[in-house]
A protein has these predicted regions:
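12-transmembrane solute porter fold
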Residues: 31-54, 303-515
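Interfacial loop-to-helix junctions that mark the boundaries of transmembrane helices
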Residues: 69, 122-126, 187-196, 249, ...
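Transmembrane-helix exit segments and adjacent C-terminal regions of multi-pass membrane proteins
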Residues: 2-34, 194, 207-213, 248, ...
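Hydrophobic transmembrane-helix bundles of small-molecule transporters
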Residues: 182-183, 187-323, 331
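Structural signature of transmembrane alpha-helices in multi-pass secondary transporters
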Residues: 45, 74-77, 81, 132, ...
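Transmembrane-helix bundle of Major Facilitator Superfamily
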Residues: 2-210, 470, 474, 497
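A residue-level signal for alpha-helical anchor/packing sites in multi-pass solute transporters
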Residues: 58, 145, 149, 179, ...
Length: 525
């Protein structure tokens, strides 16, 4: 199936690999600066997610928030983040990723300030919804711009740094939040964990305006100016010229609404705890997905540019890589959720001890990400298979440690060693799969493709957390004492292994179809 980008624009690469040029300006831009600006907001968003668990008790106390309020503090951000990814990715591809990145970061920063100033739980949740939209706006632009301005091994290294930032941010978030709350006290502390994003966000916007090439935006502006000049020349000569046509921007509003509603219907039942009519939304979501696919096909057949060109899925590397990511997130994101429940409720560990037990995992994950990034272009899919095997081994050995804790009373700190195996696998898989899944996607669709993949990950996270914690509490409820928590831990980790085995099958199939890496060096696009 032929794949034709709707819009094309060029960027040229100078002899210095760090420098790039774009049409419409004599300025030279540095990739290293672009990457710094792209990754800092990613860290901000992940710290906002990982630190909120530590802040919840103080939020509950100072705002007199109900359990439902607290649930939406957690889920509201994730929900609006998830439904924003694909529309924002498409808008960035069409209108320009640089400006959309800045706009999303500004929305995120202002919403963070509003969270910190919220006088009650209701306004806090509204601000969290907006914060999620902002993060969902700039996240796909990050992947799209890495896809646009880096190629081959350098792109793999950029995505490896992306993985390092992810691992570091997830680990630092709870520790940073705990330190801030302890330093400033309950009333000011949790608010400061939100407000701290505001100055960093404004700095990021300022640096983006200075350091981003804005290649697409310059190309669109140049085309408008050329059209106006040609129209003015024709008018000046006295010739009869047609009215200057308005620039046509096709964002496929119907397709956008259908997909947003479909993702909302799929994620909401799992985030709200299900029950009653909530599960009927899943059926509605299935119908909406079918309607969306039919609409996108019809829209393209009419010669229009659909929000997601379904030809994206004709790239085996993209469709298989997205399947690996979605099924991996289905299981892996619950690893530390279950650990926290088991340690604090079953073993009586403190929140600080629970946070610290994950630090070795984050450290080795960061190193594994950088190691994999240097080898992705030659051995990427073997790395993915090996990484999944390590995570499965780490999960299985964690169950063995839990059994030893129950039977012989060994220290729960032994879990940090088995979770390090999981960290090695998580870091290696993230760097390699991120690069290879987008390798064949045209750069003009980098944001859309990144948004689709991230949406699959968000859905996997929502479904997996609900399913696996349900298994955990289901087994805890039929027993008594510490043994019941151990049984729940083992059952939940067994469910995680099943999800990871599905991801492993998808990864093996991906290597069989696509080989171990790109068939040839990636061409300059």
């Amino acid at each position: 199936m032929a794949y034709r980008p709707a819009v094309a624009y060029n960027s040229s690469v100078s002899d210095d690999p760090d420098l790039i040029r774009v049409e419409g300006t004599d300025r030279v831009f540095r990739r290293s600066r672009i990457l710094v600006v792209l990754l800092i907001p990613i860290a901000m968003a992940l710290v906002a997610v990982s630190s909120i668990n530590v802040a919840l008790p103080t939020i509950s106390h100072t705002l007199d928030a109900s359990d439902t309020d607290l649930q939406w503090v957690l889920s509201g951000y994730a929900l609006t983040f998830g439904i924003s990814l694909v529309p924002a990715g498409r808008a960035g591809d069409v209108l320009g990723r640089g400006w959309f990145f800045v706009l999303g970061l500004l929305v995120f920063s202002l919403a963070s300030l509003a969270c910190g100033l919220a006088p009650n739980a209701e306004l806090l949740n509204v601000s969290r919804f907006v914060q999620g939209v902002g993060a969902g706006m700039y996240n796909p632009q990050t992947m799209g711009m890495i896809q646009q301005y880096w190629h081959g091994l350098e792109r793999a290294k950029a995505f490896a740094l992306f993985g390092l930032v992810v691992a570091f941010s997830v680990a630092v978030g709870p520790v940073l939040a705990g330190f801030i709350i302890q330093t400033f006290g309950e009333e000011i502390g949790w608010r400061a964990t939100f407000v701290i994003n505001f100055p960093f966000g404004l700095l990021g916007c300022f640096l983006a305006l200075r350091w981003f090439p804005f290649g697409k935006e310059r190309a669109r502006r140049a085309a408008r100016q050329a059209a106006r000049a040609a129209h003015a020349d024709g008018t000046a000569t006295g010739a009869v010229v047609p009215a200057l046509p308005r620039e046509r921007v096709d964002l496929d509003p119907v397709g956008t609404v259908l997909l947003v509603l479909a993702v909302l219907c799929v994620m909401l039942p799992f985030m709200s705890g299900g029950g009653g009519a909530a599960w009927l939304l899943l059926a509605a979501g299935s119908v909406l997905v079918v309607a969306w696919v039919l609409w996108e096909r019809r829209y393209k057949a009419r010669g229009r540019a659909p929000m997601v060109d379904l030809a994206l899925f004709s790239f085996a590397s993209f469709s298989n890589g997205t399947a690996v990511a979605g099924t991996f997130f289905l299981g892996s994101t619950s690893i530390f959720v279950v650990v926290a429940l088991y340690m604090q409720n079953g073993l009586g560990a403190s929140a600080l001890e629970t946070g610290l037990i994950g630090l070795p995992n984050a450290i080795v994950s960061a190193f594994a990400s950088m190691w994999a990034g240097r080898r992705t272009m030659t051995s990427g899919r073997t790395i993915i298979i090996g990484s999944l095997t390590l995570v499965i081994a780490g999960v299985g050995l964690s169950v063995a440690v839990a059994a030893l804790i129950e039977r012989y009373g060994i220290s729960f700190w032994w879990l940090s060693l088995t979770l390090m195996l999981c960290g090695l696998g998580q870091g290696g898989l993230g760097a390699a799969n991120q690069t290879l899944s987008l390798e064949d996607v045209p750069t003009t669709y980098g944001g859309t493709a990144g948004g689709v993949k991230s949406t699959a990950e968000r859905i996997g996270t929502a479904v997996g957390n609900a399913m696996i914690t349900g298994v955990f509490f289901g087994f805890v409820g039929v027993g008594a004492g510490t043994g019941a928590w151990t049984t729940g831990f083992a059952a939940a980790y067994g469910a995680i292994v099943v999800c990871l085995l599905v991801a492993l099958v998808a990864a093996v199939h991906d290597r069989k179809v696509s080989g171990d890496g790109p068939a040839a060096p990636a061409p300059a696009r």
